């Protein structure tokens, strides 16, 4: 497993807490575990990758032994509660909670006792429990019955706690052993949410189930109506030190600094995109206030785009998640087959993202650019490149044009149709300018580039709703034969087509139901045109079905996987037939020889939702988009060279196993070899590394590398029509090489007469390498560099 990012596009955060020593910041995410770092938001590290569900509520308790790790209590809205005393290496469920179905509040008293209180729900009843042993066990201190109440605990060291109940506003100063009714609640209600400011008596704030905000300046004895609450998502808090400062959260943070006389939002959601470092992201799941070591207080604002802090009551804010808080919530990811450095991703509320650079290092984690806000999924491309990428937002189709400098286009959904929240779309496997949109009917969109207009046609007359409320929710074409197609509906019916999706035949039996938001996972085999898998809801029924007869019948293919949702299915790119399945909490693998699925997440990958998967064709790797911990790669064979028998990546007609570079179509066996420093013909040497005739000169510096008598150092022989010395011409025997030298003075020296040279005609001359050879050699080197 290898984590790939994003390093800078954080997703939803819920809660932040200081460690008791005040030096460490802990934060809980949505399905991304628990994190800790320095107070300024640097040096983030995950301590909850082995903890499913993330953390909506969080408290940190001092260890029993000084020097040991702090004790961390993490709880989810859905009732999962766990404790760790070893920095997240292990998590244990506390005793005494009786498997709650929900958690409304988790608080810690700060007076040194570290007493914990948790308000849980189960079977429609709410119960307040207490722990005095650092969260190892809890016991009941108050039963609220069917009333959905809330708890406020003093944050300055006082033992005071306040409980909203059907009997009224209750107060205890003895850790819940006894309770005093302070007064009635402001109105009759079935639920109340509570916050308070210790700067008052205290001042308490309550929001009822009727979305009305009330204020009490006498610890709950009397209440005054303040305002009607809109854009409210159950998030509220009040300042510890400023009695008039209170805020609630929804899409925005609504804030008052004068006790409710006036209200203002901190910033609009669209302000974030021009200034993410100093403007809040939209959607506020949490607001937290902590005292700091300087005697002031710090607000933490938990958003769908990471964690922020403020030292001035949210007049200004600072983003703590621009680096290292890797809790991206991705629906899908698409890596370009033309350039694996190009990766596009669709996120929950962090938009459509791209990256064009892979970081170096042992654990390369990518940074992404958000080029459009919103929620995007089902990224699809006809040829796997980014020249045309289609995806969906809940309301329109997004088209990315261009690999290097992408630009975006928007298309409408078909009118009067039904589909999941993020509808399934599939690129036409035979036309990069077309895609399919399954709904009650199947539609095909195609771009006419001559007039730059999109046409939308009803591709098939088949009504997949069968007159009811269902619709087509997953579609796949066979990579073996694009005329063969497979489809699933939201209620688990399966269909198959043999004419590219024009006509359909329903299968004899059912497939899994869909995920209401995203549809099913559907995978057509790249090895067998008749094999297809469909994954979906596996709660009480098999989550994966397989057909090996072209979709005529399906059978369960689920052995080894328990009750869970199957979000994604993928097939290894090496032709081995190995499969992976991404589920609600982990990843499973199944090889063709296996009789069951094997869980492979282990301890190296996070326990989270593995929403989608793609096969990386240039390496034997499956890339997962997770909903909470970003992008993760699972490598089948980490040491594999990346060459698989069934692949021809560069399209030069030579399979990867026979090609010396299957990413360059100009390099293949039989190609013309050039003096360019590249082995073009896979022999496996380049001309500047070959000396076939053994004359000491490589081919690129030798005018004939098949004849050892021909080289720049050879003796030129005139008149034989052979350029022995590679100067570009044969020597003419009648052409003097230079001015005739004077006869030697030494009379004893033999005279050389014309004709004494025998059969060489007296013209044999030995040339010593001169300046011209140096110039020729330098020119040859320069040419090689220019061509390299």
List where the protein language model places each region:
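Disulfide-rich extracellular modules and peptides
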Residues: 46, 93, 140, 181, ...
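A cross-kingdom C-terminal cell-surface attachment/processing module
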Residues: 768-785
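Beta-propeller blade termini and top-face loops
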Residues: 1-640
């Amino acid at each position: 497993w290898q984590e790939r990012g994003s390093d800078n596009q954080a997703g939803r955060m819920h809660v932040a807490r200081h460690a008791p020593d005040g030096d460490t910041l802990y934060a809980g995410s949505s399905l991304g575990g628990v994190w800790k770092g320095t107070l300024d938001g640097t040096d983030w590290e995950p301590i909850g990758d082995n903890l499913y569900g993330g953390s909506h509520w969080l408290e940190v308790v001092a260890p029993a032994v000084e020097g040991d790790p702090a004790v961390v209590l993490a709880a989810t809205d859905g009732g999962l509660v766990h404790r760790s005393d070893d920095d997240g290496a292990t998590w244990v469920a506390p005793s005494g909670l009786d498997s709650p179905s929900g958690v409304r509040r988790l608080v810690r008293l700060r007076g040194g006792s570290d007493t914990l209180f948790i308000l849980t729900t189960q079977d429609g009843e709410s119960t307040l429990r207490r722990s005095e042993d650092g969260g190892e066990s809890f016991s009941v201190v108050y039963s609220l019955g069917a009333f959905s109440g809330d708890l406020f605990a003093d944050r300055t060291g006082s033992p005071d706690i306040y409980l909203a109940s059907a009997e009224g506003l209750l107060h205890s100063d003895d850790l819940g052993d006894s309770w005093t009714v302070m007064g009635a609640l402001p109105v009759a209600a079935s639920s109340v949410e509570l916050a308070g400011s210790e700067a008052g008596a205290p001042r308490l704030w309550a929001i009822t189930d009727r979305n009305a905000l009330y204020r009490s300046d006498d610890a709950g004895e009397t209440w005054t109506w303040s305002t009607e609450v809109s854009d409210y998502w159950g998030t509220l808090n009040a300042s510890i030190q400023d009695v008039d400062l209170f805020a609630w959260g929804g899409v925005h943070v609504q804030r008052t600094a004068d006790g409710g006389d006036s209200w203002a939002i901190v910033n609009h959601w669209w302000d974030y995109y021009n200034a993410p470092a100093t403007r809040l992201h939209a959607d506020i799941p949490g607001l937290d206030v902590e005292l700091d070591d300087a005697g002031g207080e710090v607000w933490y604002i938990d958003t769908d785009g990471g964690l922020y802090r403020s030292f001035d009551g949210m007049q200004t804010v600072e983003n703590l998640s621009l680096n290292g808080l890797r809790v991206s919530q991705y629906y899908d990811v698409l890596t370009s087959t033309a350039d694996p450095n190009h990766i596009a991703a669709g996120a929950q509320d962090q938009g459509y993202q791209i990256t064009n650079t892979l970081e170096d290092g042992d654990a390369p984690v990518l940074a992404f650019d958000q080029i459009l806000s919103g929620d995007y999924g089902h990224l699809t491309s006809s040829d796997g490149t980014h020249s045309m990428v289609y995806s969906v937002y809940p309301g329109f189709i997004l088209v990315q044009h261009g690999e290097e400098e992408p630009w975006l286009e928007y298309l409408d959904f078909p009118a009067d149709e039904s589909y999941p929240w993020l509808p399934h779309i599939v690129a036409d496997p035979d036309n990069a300018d077309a895609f399919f949109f399954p709904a009650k009917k199947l539609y095909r969109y195609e771009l006419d580039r001559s007039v730059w207009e999109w046409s939308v046609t009803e591709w098939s007359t088949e009504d997949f709703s069968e007159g009811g409320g269902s619709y087509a929710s997953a579609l796949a074409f066979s990579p073996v034969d694009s005329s063969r197609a497979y489809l699933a509906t939201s209620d688990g019916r399966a269909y198959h087509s043999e004419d590219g999706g024009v006509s359909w035949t329903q299968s004899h039996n059912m497939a899994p139901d869909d995920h209401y938001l995203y549809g099913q996972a559907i995978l057509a085999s790249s090895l067998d045109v008749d094999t297809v898998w469909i994954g979906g809801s596996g709660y009480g029924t098999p989550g994966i079905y397989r057909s090996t007869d072209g979709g005529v019948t399906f059978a369960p293919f689920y052995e080894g996987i328990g009750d869970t949702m199957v979000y994604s299915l993928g097939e290894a790119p090496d032709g081995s037939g190995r499969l992976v399945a991404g589920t609600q909490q982990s990843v499973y693998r199944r090889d063709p020889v296996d009789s069951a699925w094997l869980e492979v997440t282990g301890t190296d990958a996070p326990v989270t939702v593995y929403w989608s998967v793609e096969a990386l064709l240039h390496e034997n790797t499956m890339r997962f988009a997770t909903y909470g911990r970003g992008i993760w790669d699972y490598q089948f064979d980490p040491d594999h060279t990346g060459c698989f028998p069934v692949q021809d990546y560069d399209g030069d007609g030579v399979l990867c196993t026979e090609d010396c570079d299957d990413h360059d179509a100009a390099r293949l066996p039989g190609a013309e070899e050039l003096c360019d420093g590249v082995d073009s013909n896979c022999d496996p040497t380049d001309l500047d590394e070959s000396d076939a005739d053994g004359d000491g000169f490589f081919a690129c510096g030798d005018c004939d590398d098949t004849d050892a008598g021909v080289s720049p150092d050879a003796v030129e022989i005139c008149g034989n029509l052979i350029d022995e010395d590679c100067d570009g011409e044969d020597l003419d025997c009648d052409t003097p090489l230079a001015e005739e030298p004077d006869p030697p003075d030494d009379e004893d020296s033999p005279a050389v007469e014309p004709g004494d040279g025998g059969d060489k005609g007296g013209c044999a001359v030995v040339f010593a390498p001169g300046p011209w050879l140096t110039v020729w050699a330098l020119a040859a080197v320069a040419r090689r560099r220019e061509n390299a």
